[in-house]
Structure formats: structure tokens, C-alpha cells
């Protein structure tokens, strides 16, 4: 009976939110005001750290300040990071489902423990550029929501962090040079990629990576360009690749029951907010990718978002051979590994939705 009720709520949610996810849909402008009505309080738990630009430049301005300002005080929001709530990120589906948060955000890799198909949106090597990553994200949003709705939640935005790249303690000139090295990874598809390169994947929590690199516990590590700079990795690494191996895509989700209780004008107001945030977050992900590299290599004139490294690194330019190897590993190792973990249905979803956009098909 409970499952039936959740499906009913999910169907109603689909009708209310679906316009947010249609590829190519013109973005609605956020309404400048709301008519008088009952006050709405919104609790949001979003980025891992309160210092991240996604939090300071998007979440706080929109989900706290602008909601109140543009709604004439009818909507009031509080925003906290995972760290401020002592969360790892894996709890977000359950947190939103239980109503402890109305809006939650986390990386798809983190959320995939509950919904395995989420891994397929951001497989290692799948999207060489951020434009492809966004087209895949837009197309997969309604697909993954069919699984998420079983939990009474629904994604309304998928957005990127800066490109995930390789930082190393010692020089390297190509992906092939990583053979034999110990590489910190996260998520199943990056483990598959690093293993296929002949390197040894090592799972280490992000806060511990700096000391692991410093002490030589790992030789290299994968993270976002800007994330590595923010964590002071240039102090303990010398070379950084500019080849995106993934995008650490993340998503904002809402509680379906909570959403359906809102008045139509409030839902419309929030839809406009999410649409505006989506554009800002994709623009930020694009700008922050190059900015992170420039800050890491000491290019002060173009380091605008992150902090300039005091110990400039060497940028390792991607080669055609690197790109070809990454695509080959995606086709032969990463994609089959994903389908094996997720099931045949995920392979069918991949071929039907992602393959036409990425040019890679499961099963050839």
C-alpha cells in the first residue's frame, strides 16, 4: 500500500516538474514576485563544503537570499552544507525522503548506492567536453527519476563540478605513464578506468588525500581541477592533467510529497528558480574547470575563482593518444562494468538515451 501511494505521488510530481528536464526547453525566467499567501519555509542541504563556489555563488544567493527577496518574504529558506550538518552525502536520499530536508544535493556517484543507474550518467571517459556532459544529463534526468521516485524523491537539476583530472607527485606525460602507480579514485567507473590503465586504484576520503600524497601513500589522485587547488594539492603534487576523465555530476532533489503540497504559484516560482540555477551551475562548472588549471599552474591573470597556487604545477596537455585510450577503455571496460553492476535494464537505458549522444553503445 505504501509503495502504491509513493507511485501516486511520483506521478503527480512528474506532471509538475517534467518541464524542468525536457532537453532544449526554453528556460523560464524566475518570477520577480509572488501573490500574498501562506508562508513557505524551505530547508536545503546541498554542497559538501561551505567554501565551494557552487555553495557560495549559487546555493546561498538563490536558495536563501533571492527566494526571500523575490517572493516578497513569502518564501524563506535555510541552506547548509554537508559538512555543517555532519553528513557524508550518502544520506541525502533518505534525508529528503524523510522530510528532514526539502531540497538536497549530492554527487550522482554518492547517490548511486541507492539508485545504481545514476552511475551511468557520468561514466569515466563518457563525456570529453562539458557540452556533451550536459546533453547526457538532460536526457537522463527523466530516466533516473523513474528509479528515484520509488524513494519518494525526484531530481530537478543535474549539474557539474569542474572536470575531474589527474594530479601526480611525479612527472607524467600521458595516461599510459600512470601504469604501476597508486591512484586515489572514487566511484566504480573510475576504479575500472584506473585498473585498465595498469595502475592501482586506492579509495581514500577526500579530506585525507593531501596527507596521502604528501607521505607517498598514493602517487596520484583524481579530483576536480578547482577542488584540488582548494585542497592545496599543488603543495604535494607537481603535475596535473587537463584531460577530463569525468565531471562529478551532482543533482538537486526534492521530496515529492512536499512538492505536491505547494500551491501552484509557489511551484512555478521554484521551477523558475531551479532553471536559473541550472544555467548558473553549468556556466560555473565550465569556467571553474579552466580556472582550476590556471590557478594550479600559477597563471595569476586568469585565476579568478579559486586560489592561486603558491607552488605552481606543470600542466600535462592531453594527446590524441590519451583521448583514444580513454574511449577504448570506456567501451571495453567501464561501460560493461557498469551494466554488469546495474543490470541489463541499465544497458538498454544507456543504448536508448546516452549512446546517440556519446557515440558509444553497449554491446557494440
Task: Give the ranges of each region predicted by the language model.
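Binding-interface segments
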Residues: 5
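Bacterial N-terminal signal peptides
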Residues: 11-25
Amino acid at each position: 500500500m505504501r509503495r502504491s501511494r509513493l507511485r501516486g505521488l511520483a506521478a503527480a510530481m512528474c506532471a509538475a516538474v517534467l518541464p524542468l528536464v525536457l532537453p532544449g526547453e526554453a528556460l523560464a525566467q524566475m518570477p520577480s514576485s509572488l501573490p500574498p499567501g501562506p508562508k513557505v519555509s524551505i530547508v536545503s542541504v546541498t554542497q559538501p563544503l561551505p567554501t565551494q563556489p557552487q555553495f557560495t555563488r549559487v546555493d546561498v544567493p538563490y536558495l536563501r537570499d533571492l527566494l526571500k527577496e523575490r517572493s516578497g518574504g513569502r518564501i524563506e529558506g535555510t541552506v547548509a552544507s554537508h559538512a555543517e550538518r555532519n553528513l557524508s552525502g550518502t544520506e541525502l536520499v533518505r534525508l529528503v525522503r524523510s522530510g528532514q530536508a526539502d531540497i538536497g544535493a549530492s554527487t550522482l556517484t554518492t547517490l548511486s548506492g541507492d539508485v545504481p543507474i545514476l552511475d551511468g550518467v557520468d561514466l569515466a571517459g563518457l563525456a570529453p567536453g562539458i557540452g556533451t556532459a550536459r546533453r547526457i544529463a538532460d536526457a537522463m534526468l527523466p530516466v533516473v527519476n523513474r528509479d528515484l521516485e520509488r524513494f519518494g524523491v525526484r531530481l530537478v537539476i543535474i549539474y557539474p563540478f569542474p572536470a575531474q583530472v589527474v594530479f601526480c607527485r611525479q612527472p607524467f606525460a600521458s595516461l599510459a605513464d600512470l601504469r604501476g602507480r597508486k591512484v586515489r579514485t572514487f566511484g566504480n567507473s573510475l576504479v575500472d578506468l584506473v585498473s585498465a590503465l595498469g595502475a592501482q586504484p586506492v579509495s581514500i576520503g577526500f579530506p585525507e588525500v593531501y596527507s596521502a600524497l604528501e607521505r607517498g601513500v598514493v602517487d596520484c589522485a583524481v579530483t576536480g581541477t578547482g577542488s584540488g587547488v582548494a585542497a592545496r594539492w599543488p603543495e604535494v603534487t607537481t603535475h596535473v592533467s587537463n584531460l577530463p576523465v569525468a565531471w562529478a555530476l551532482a543533482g538537486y532533489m526534492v521530496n515529492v510529497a512536499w512538492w505536491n503540497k505547494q500551491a501552484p504559484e509557489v511551484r512555478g516560482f521554484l521551477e523558475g528558480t531551479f532553471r536559473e540555477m541550472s544555467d548558473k551551475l553549468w556556466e560555473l562548472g565550465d569556467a571553474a574547470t579552466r580556472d582550476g588549471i590556471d590557478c594550479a599552474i600559477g597563471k595569476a591573470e586568469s585565476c579568478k575563482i579559486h586560489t592561486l597556487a603558491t607552488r605552481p604545477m606543470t600542466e600535462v596537455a592531453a594527446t590524441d593518444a590519451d583521448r583514444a585510450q580513454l574511449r577504448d577503455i570506456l567501451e571495453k571496460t567501464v561501460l560493461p562494468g557498469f551494466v554488469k553492476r546495474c543490470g541489463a535494464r541499465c544497458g538498454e537505458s544507456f543504448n536508448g538515451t546516452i549512446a546517440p549522444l556519446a557515440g558509444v553503445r553497449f554491446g557494440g
